[in-house]
Amino acid sequence: MRVEELASVHNDDSHAPPHTLEDATVLQIVPALREEPIARTVLDVASALVQSGARALVAAEEGPLVGELTAFGGEWAPLVNATVNPFRLRRSARTLERLIASEHVDVVHAQSIGGAWIARMAATRIPVRLVTTLLDVPPSGLRGYWAGALARGDWVITPSNFAAAPVMARHKIPIERVTVIPRSIDVAAFDPAAVDAARVEAVQDAWRIMQTARILLVPGRVAPWNGQLILPDVARLLLDSGVRGFVFVLAGEHRSYRKYARAVAKEAEVKGVQAFIRFAGHCRDMPAAFAAADTVVVPAIEAPVFGRAVAQAQAMGRPVVTSDVGVLPEHVAAPPEMPEEVRTGWVAKAGDAGELAHALGEAFALDETAYRTMSERARHFAEYMFSPRSAVAATHAVYGALLARPLADSGERVGSAAKRAEGR
């Protein structure tokens, strides 16, 4: 149901501020309820809220997921927030303020730049706890200015330390107001138990690779920022060290950046490693592609937006060798940040063929028992770090921590807003 249809039921003066999440009303703000990762996460959080006894509202422009939201007991409120037009933002802020008051909203969680501005403006006029979620990659310039609203919540959720560090420094956010919750992946689809042998064989047949070859899967578009140009050097170093029987499979679209793809092929020819590098093109069955691989290689030289390939590979129980840019190192359990006994992969310096080859040499050196153990660790690590269930639980913990505080202690903004509300 739309929130307006329920306003008469919930709009009374008997509302007492809750101290637990089960008694709370939580309003999440996203641009639109379309099938995209952020909206899917919002629905996961809302569904769990309803199951716990809380009331879950989502303010967004209409989309195909509205029906799914209302089917499990969530409520939708129309709200334009995918804008930085100041006039539309002010109008939406007034709409949000009325919604917070009429529905007795306890926590507002803004997950877009426009939504954060709207929530911030509304929260200066009515007391409410405000949670914001940072973007995956820290923006700069004018977009960085607008994105600053995402740093002004009473509690800030960030998908990574990489995303949080510059924002925390710029806006002087204390660490106790920040929680890292990695973006979730579909750990049910990316599950070794869900991929049968026929799917794996189909992928291998499409790649025209012998089943005895050690497949080093390089997922992602063949593009400059993904760093595939280093692979011929890595292949040559491996061959010179006596390693044989491997092939790099570049599983990603390679026509958008033809010049770069040709440069990779030319470098392979110059190094004499053409037979060890295969351009496989776009793969429609990535779980099967990961299952076919022995090791997954992510040689990016620029920070990726999400870094999902590293998470998906580990969910499929595959060791990962990745570069040290952006969020990628945070998505692998590897020394020195983690003990050797919990290792799920290796992190190499971006653009360093020697480090990448050395890491792959260590991966090749694993015996069957050690490989199986690392594979199991990788799967468990992915379930803990990247499952939707983990993301929901961590988000609910943030809501619960805020609700446990007196509203006036949620920040200077909320405290002053509460005083203004009392004086009206």
What are these regions (language model features)?
Residues 162, 184:
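Carbohydrate-associated surface elements
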Residues 362, 369-385, 394-397:
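A short, well-ordered alpha-helix in the C-terminal region of glycosyltransferases
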Residues 334-353, 363-368:
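Conserved acidic donor-binding segment of nucleotide-sugar-dependent glycosyltransferases
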